[in-house]
Amino acid sequence: MKLKNSALSLCLTLLTSQLMMQATAFAQKDNLPALTISATKSAASIAPALQATIDKISANAMRGHLSFLASDLLEGRDTPSRGLDLEAEYIAAQFRASGLEAVGDDGYFQTADWNKIKSARRNPDAAENADVATIPPLKVRNVVGILRGSDPLLRDSYVLVTAHYDHLGIRKSLFGEKIYNGANDDASGTVSVIALAQAFAAMPERPKRSIVFMTFFGEEKGLVGSRYYGAHPIFPIEKTVAGINIEQVGRTDDTEGAQVASLAVTGFDFSEVGAIIQQAGLATGVKVWKHPVNSNRYFGASDNQALADQGIPAHTVSVAYEFPDYHGTGDHWDKIDYENMAKVDRTVALAIASIANDDKVPQWDAANPKAARYLAAWKARQVRN
């Protein structure tokens, strides 16, 4: 049963107020300030304006957001579900408050019909079937906002910053219904996108290129939301220079050992994006690395894949590829290492700024055979346009 629009809006208003009070309380607890980068030699090279920007990424504020988004109230954020709809409204409210421009077909939303998507996946010809048109639409939404660039020559090129905001929802078992809250997977990525959007939007001087902040529905159903965007891009693919997708950055208890101040990149050496993030890590004290197995293995397992298939140099960053509560009921918000999460998000912020302010765009590695299909897609897109 779905909430009526008015009831949903009222519920969201009340919950947003409650959440912001909670976030403020977390930030003020024990007079804790937002984390700052330690004054190392490498950190000293960060421009003051950029340093001020990344210092706005607060562990305590992110704790407040995540404790709501991964709460039982959102019922595990299945696609589609009431909880997912509520989260979409919440993300849009954060984008609006940050001052991002709405660029979807419905404000901050890129809307799709879940029933049509399901029919098309079962039968590619079903989308043209008259019977499909008689099924009532079931709306699902990517949430998207943009920070326009400042350079007249580069502002019409785009850097994507993404995460998925869905999870597994409620599932039945022999012991009753269980809620899968998905704090690390991927409320951590969603909150990171919100934090990055807020930080960049507060900059006194915007980056040269435009930065698009987007959260996808349906990743757990097979990268559905990101594939929908790839097929229906809001911004020209040939003008989209890179994508950084944020997935599972909250937990440090990887099954291979603790991953503190560590950030892995999928397809690390497929393009120059991995090296750009690694360079950012030198300034923040975060080890950015290629996992010998999982870097390549998981390149196709998250939403970056749908963008890479279009030729965009897009990669996913993660702290823990595998952790004890992965796709389990124990993936709760109180198991997140928020200070570490803020530190890695600052690293991502520096990488985004580097790409957004560089006249040159990241390239696929033509010498790497694993990148060949993506390079071919990029070349084909340039030829067509």
Predicted regions and their residues:
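Second-shell loop/turn segments in exported
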Residues: P48-K56, D72-R82, E128-T134, L174-D186, ...
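Alpha-helical metal-binding/catalytic segments enriched in His/Glu/Asp
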Residues: G145, S157, V161-G222, V348
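N-terminal hydrophobic or amphipathic helices/low-complexity stretches enriched
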Residues: Q28-L86, I91-V103, D156, D365, ...
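His/Asp/Glu-rich mid-to-C-terminal helical/loop segments that flank catalytic regions of hydrolases
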Residues: A202, P324-N385
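A non-catalytic alpha/beta surface segment that caps or lines the substrate-entry region
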Residues: R77-R148
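Zn-dependent metallopeptidase/amidohydrolase metal-coordination segment
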Residues: N294-V344
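Bacterial N-terminal signal peptides
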Residues: S9-M20
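Metal-dependent peptidase/peptidase-like ectodomains
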Residues: F216-T316
